[in-house]
Structures are given as structure tokens and as C-alpha cells.
Curated annotation (Swiss-Prot):
CDD domains to which the protein is assigned, alphabetical: cupin_PMI_typeII_C, GDP-M1P_Guanylyltransferase
Name of the gene this protein is made from: noeJ
Pfam families xref list: ManC_GMP_beta-helix (PF22640), MannoseP_isomer (PF01050), NTP_transferase (PF00483)
Enzyme class, spelled out: transferase
Gene Ontology MF, one: mannose-1-phosphate guanylyltransferase (GTP) activity
Taxonomic source organism: Sinorhizobium fredii (strain NBRC 101917 / NGR234)
Protein name (Swiss-Prot/TrEMBL): Mannose-1-phosphate guanylyltransferase
Catalytic activity, as annotated: alpha-D-mannose 1-phosphate + GTP + H(+) = GDP-alpha-D-mannose + diphosphate
Enzyme nomenclature, EC number: 2.7.7.13
Superkingdom of the source species: Bacteria
Keywords: GTP-binding, Nodulation, Nucleotide-binding, Nucleotidyltransferase, Plasmid, Transferase
């Protein structure tokens, strides 16, 4: 295994950190925590903004950053945390890389799951990679990427307490002090007190009915299951070997057979697909005798519905959250959001009105958690399925594009290319393209001819012509692309050359 290029990559520049024998009494001697951020998912609960190609962790819902970026900032203290490991999928890989780049965050690795296999396999992947890179005594913090959390002294204290328990071999989960009888979360019953706000886990409870949730809340012994975990890599691997060996063996084979592609680690598809699709709670946490819970009371929300977004945003005097291009009249207790067309809402109470570039959702906030049923109905209809799959804006290594208009035999897009980046050299069989430079400078290659486009200039790319677009300038390049032809699908493309990092040669860049 050591000879595999991935293993050499993982072990390079790092030393194994051993835990001092007195670390349980002195938490200042604990090793750095290695965050493993779970950034997969399908993107259905906050439709129409979240889609299969853009899950809610990549949306700016609370504050100026996306939820994924907020998660990265939460583990940015280099005195406490090592570089984060991100587990995601093929569809989200460029979003992960781009949003980390925007913050200036260096990721340890971006690991791509070839197929979704739930959280047990994802946690096993993170544990195996962290053990190989940092040593089996390394502390692993597993975080969902789509939660809203206030990082204050209470939060930091809970993480320290979890570290101390994890260093003793406990598999620690974070239980959130419930503030209402929620039916959308699982619950954890606390058991024997272990010290420093940590209890043994007595049992896990499935998402309850409203009546049962109220009864659990009344006891004072139950906490919401946050889906956050902290443990030593060795501990979780040993427990998986005992309680979920089929998950662990498939993951080990997938890591051993993985390949490194540019900035991504691609798990071996055949091996990883053999892993059962099961949550870490079912596979392990409900079976192990070493489960512990940190009883936490920091501000937390999984933002799992538009109702949750409304509750977590600052409301005006009418109880409204108004974001973007919106006007509300005689409306209260509502969430109205649009960054595209102007939304005007009148005489409404307790509703969510959400507009994306190509769809609008209107529904009662109290029923917003049931939006998944609506998305399934849309996905089952061939006329609306694309509204659940494709987000109008897609991010690529070179920049990205937004689809502005679709029609019979034509499509209009806004392209944006980062400085020094270029697209692959390619051609289309069924469409021609017009490019209009709106901002910046474009280098356009058509067959053997290279043309420089400035603002307000345009160029035509005939059907079947080999072509490429690059940005040799120092500012973002923006173009309007008009496609015309009999077929405009994304699979009508033949790549002639595709530079792995989409970088322009230094000799063709402008400026010093």
C-alpha cells in the first residue's frame, strides 16, 4: 500500500502525532484536529435554489458566505485545526475548489465519491486517509457542510470536551439542546456522566411524532442529533471493523485503488460501489458501547427547510425576511427572496416566495419541510425534470456560465472566465456560437487563427470548427454566448485538447 502514489501523497510532509499520556487532564496537549467536511447530497430541500448540481451548502443563505465557506471558516484556526479534508462528488468538485479558493483556504484533499453511499462510507474514507496521513492517533472532526453554527466560547468549549473524550477512545457525537419539539431531527438520550459536559449515549431515537418529541423535551435528557462527530482515527477504524466490516473493507479497497487527478482524489468506483449505503448512526453509533455525546447549547441549525432559513435570519418589524429584488406590502411572517426578477408580494402571511433564474416556489412556511415531495413530482415529469437537476449557474475550473434563456434551436448564456484561465480546445457537431465580449479581454482560437476580442466586439464560431476561449488579462472576462443549432445538449462536444488546470501559458498573458 505504501507504494501507491496516493499513499505517498498522503504521507508526504507530515509526521505521526502521538497523544501524551496525561493529555486527558491537560487538553492543551491535544494534537491538532483534522476536519473532514461532508459536502455531498442532492440539493432538494431548498428548491429552487438548491439543485442536483448545486446543493444548499454552496448557497449564500445566512450572511455573506456560503454554508460550505462558513464551515471552512469555522475550522480556520491553525493552532487548533489542520487543513480540512473534503468528501464530495464529481458534480460538486469545482464548487468545492472554487469556494475554498475564494476564501484563500488550502484544502488537505478533495476526495470524490464515484457513487453516493451515505455517511458510513464517507466517514470510513476520511478515517482511512487521515490515519495514513497523520497517524492513527489523529483526531478527526466530521462536519456536515450545510449547517449554520455560531462559533463562540460555548462552541469552542464543546469541541475541547469532545477532544478529551475522543482521546480516551470514545466516539463522540454532538447533541444540541432542543428548543422546541422538533419532528425533523433524530434525538440522543444522554446516559452516565463522563465529565466535561460529556455523557455516555443511552440510546438513539428516530425522528419522533410531535407528541413523542414533546415528551422527550419534557424529560430534559434528550438532545437533537446534529450529525457532527469527533474521534481518533484508530478508534473509528477499529469500531467499523467490528460492527461494519463490509463498509470498511470496501472503503479500504477504494482508497488503495484510488487515483490522483489534478487537485482531486478519485476513489476506485468498482470497490467503493460495494460499500453498503448506510448512515454512520445505523452502521456503528447505535451498536458501539463507546458512543458518547457532548451536551451542547451553542446556536445551531441544519437549515433543512425554508422555514429554518426564515427563523435564522433577522426579521423586520412585520416578521418578514426580505432578500434581493423584492417588495412586500401588507405581508407578514414571510420569507421573500429573489436575486433575479423583481418579486412583489401582497397580502400574504407565513409564506415562502423564492425565485431563481428559471423557477419560482410559493408555499406556506409551516409546510416547507415537505418540499421534497414537490421536487419528486417535478423530477418525474420530463418537461420539468431539468429544474431539479441543473442549476442555471455552473462552476468550472476556468470560471463558469449562467444559462439566461432557452428556446427552440437557441440558447443564451453569460460566460465568465477567470484571469489566466482558458477552456479546452473543442468542437460541436450540431451548433454554432456567437461570442460578444462584455468585459475584459478574450483570446479566441478558431482552427489555426487567434483573435483578441475587446469589450463590445464579437466573433462567430461556425458549426464543427475547432475553437477555444481564454482570458489573457488581469480582470474577469465576461461574454454573452448565443448558441444556435438543431441540438444544444452538453454532450455535443468533442475535446481536442484539455489542459488539466486550464491555465494559459505565461507567454500569452498580458501585463507584467
Amino acid at each position: 500500500m505504501n507504494s501507491h502514489p496516493l499513499m505517498r501523497l498522503l504521507r508526504s510532509r507530515h509526521t505521526v502525532m502521538k497523544l501524551p499520556s496525561n493529555a486527558i487532564k491537560n487538553d492543551t496537549m491535544l494534537p491538532k484536529i483534522i476536519p473532514a467536511i461532508m459536502a455531498g447530497g442532492r440539493g432538494t430541500r431548498l428548491w429552487p435554489l438548491s439543485r442536483a448540481t448545486a446543493a444548499k451548502q454552496f448557497l449564500k443563505l445566512i450572511g455573506e458566505e456560503t454554508l460550505f465557506q462558513d464551515t471552512l471558516k469555522r475550522v480556520s484556526d491553525a493552532k487548533v485545526y489542520g487543513a480540512p479534508l473534503v468528501i464530495t462528488n464529481e458534480e460538486f468538485r469545482f464548487l468545492v475548489a472554487e469556494q475554498a479558493r475564494e476564501l484563500g483556504v488550502t484544502l488537505s484533499s478533495i476526495v470524490l465519491e464515484p457513487v453516493p453511499r451515505n455517511t458510513a462510507a464517507a466517514v470510513a474514507v476520511a478515517a482511512r486517509i487521515v490515519a495514513d496521513r497523520f497517524g492513527e492517533d489523529a483526531l478527526l472532526l466530521v462536519l456536515p457542510s450545510d449547517h449554520a453554527i455560531t462559533v463562540d466560547d460555548t462552541y469552542k468549549k464543546c469541541v475541547r470536551s469532545a477532544c478529551i473524550a475522543a482521546a480516551e477512545g470514545k466516539l463522540v457525537t454532538f447533541g444540541i439542546q432542543p428548543t422546541w419539539p422538533a419532528t425533523g431531527y433524530g434525538y440522543i438520550e444522554r446516559g452516565t456522566y463522563l465529565g466535561k459536559d460529556v455523557h455516555a449515549v443511552q440510546c438513539f431515537v428516530e425522528k419522533p411524532s410531535l407528541e413523542k418529541a414533546a415528551a422527550l423535551l419534557e424529560t430534559g435528557n434528550y438532545y437533537w442529533n446534529s450529525g457532527m462527530f469527533l474521534f481518533q482515527a484508530a478508534s473509528i477504524i477499529a469500531e467499523l471493523e467490528e460492527h461494519a466490516p463490509d463498509v470498511l473493507s470496501a472503503v479500504h479497497a477504494a482508497v488503495r485503488g484510488s487515483t490522483v487527478d489534478a487537485d482531486f482524489i478519485r476513489l476506485a468506483p468498482e470497490s467503493f460501489s460495494q460499500a453498503p449505503s448506510i448512515s454512520i448512526d445505523y452502521a456503528l453509533m447505535e451498536k458501539t458501547a463507546n458512543a458518547a455525546v457532548v451536551c451542547s447549547d451553542f446556536a445551531w441549525s441544519d437549515l433543512g427547510s425554508w422555514d429554518a432559513v426564515w427563523k435564522n435570519e433577522e426579521q423586520n418589524a412585520d416578521g418578514n425576511v426580505l432578500k434581493g429584488n423584492v417588495t412586500a406590502c401588507n405581508t407578514k411572517n414571510s420569507l421573500v427572496l429573489s436575486h433575479t426578477a423583481h418579486l412583489a408580494v401582497q397580502g400574504m402571511d407565513g409564506v415562502a416566495v423564492i425565485a431563481s433564474e428559471d423557477a419560482v416556489f410559493v408555499g406556506r412556511l409551516e409546510e416547507a419541510h415537505e418540499i421534497g415531495n414537490l421536487v419528486k413530482r417535478l423530477a418525474a415529469d420530463e418537461n420539468t425534470a431539468r429544474l431539479t437537476e441543473l442549476h442555471p449557474t455552473l462552476i468550472r475550473p476556468w470560471g463558469g456560465y449562467t444559462t439566461m434563456l432557452n428556446g427552440d434551436r437557441f440558447q443564451v448564456r453569460r460566460l465568465f472566465v477567470r484571469p489566466g484561465k482558458m477552456l479546452s480546445l473543442h468542437k460541436h457537431f450540431h451548433r454554432s456560437e456567437h461570442w460578444i465580449c462584455v468585459k475584459g479581454t478574450a483570446e479566441v482560437t478558431i482552427e489555426d487563427r487567434v483573435t483578441i476580442l475587446h469589450e463590445n466586439q464579437s466573433i462567430y464560431i461556425p458549426e464543427g470548427a475547432i475553437h477555444r476561449l481564454g482570458n489573457p488579462g488581469k480582470i474577469m472576462l465576461e461574454l454573452v454566448e448565443i448558441q444556435t443549432g438543431a441540438y444544444l445538449g452538453e454532450d455535443d462536444i468533442i475535446r481536442v485538447a484539455d489542459e488539466s488546470r486550464n491555465e494559459m501559458p505565461d507567454s500569452r498573458r498580458t501585463g507584467p
